[in-house]
Swiss-Prot record:
GO terms for molecular function: adenylate kinase activity; ATP binding. GO terms for cellular component: cytoplasm. Catalyzes the reversible transfer of the terminal phosphate group between ATP and AMP. Plays an important role in cellular energy homeostasis and in adenine nucleotide metabolism. It catalyses: AMP + ATP = 2 ADP. Consists of three domains, a large central CORE domain and two small peripheral domains, NMPbind and LID, which undergo movements during catalysis. The LID domain closes over the site of phosphoryl transfer upon ATP binding. Assembling and dissambling the active center during each catalytic cycle provides an effective means to prevent ATP hydrolysis. Belongs to the adenylate kinase family. PANTHER family: NUCLEOTIDE KINASE. ATP binds at G10, A11, G12, K13, G14, T15, R127, A178. This is Adenylate kinase. Keywords: ATP-binding, Cytoplasm, Kinase, Nucleotide biosynthesis, Nucleotide-binding, Transferase.
Amino acid sequence: MRLILLGPPGAGKGTQAGLLTKKHGIPQLSTGDMLRAAVAQQSEIGKRAKAVMDAGQLVSDEIVNQIVSERIDAPDCANGFILDGYPRTVPQAQALSQMLSGKGLKLDAVIELKVDENALVKRMESRVAETIAKGGQVRSDDNPEAFRKRLVEYREKTAPLSSYYAGTGELRVINGMAPVEEVAAEIERILVPA
């Protein structure tokens, strides 16, 4: 099972990926985690990524694509994986398609969690309030203004992936505002049709 979860920040992608990982025993591949691992392992590509990050620059698609390709080849991905935070752009999606094709693989689904942005802001605010009430630490970017900026960035850069994957026939859209259990059940119906 090879899939991509799409949706803006706060849509519940991480929650759903965690449930899928537990149920199906496939890893959740996060771009950030993959970059950190490549740097820590001091692989050739990891050294290139570290040099770019140390210079305060964004890691190029070429480097990210290579790191993803190497990660997909790992034994724990033999039965599938969930991509989280990749691809972020249409060129990355096209590179992923070529990469998988070259390995004799293809995506099983691209699932977009459709959500109402105003409701997401309210959801984020209540999550912050709960964290504070429990005495927990709140991320510096967990405030309405920063969150709205992240939503705008998503809309501008990542949302075009919906059109791209709709065009390939791989996109499945579900209501991400439903309760966690309902969203999970809908994802299962898509992945394991009756």
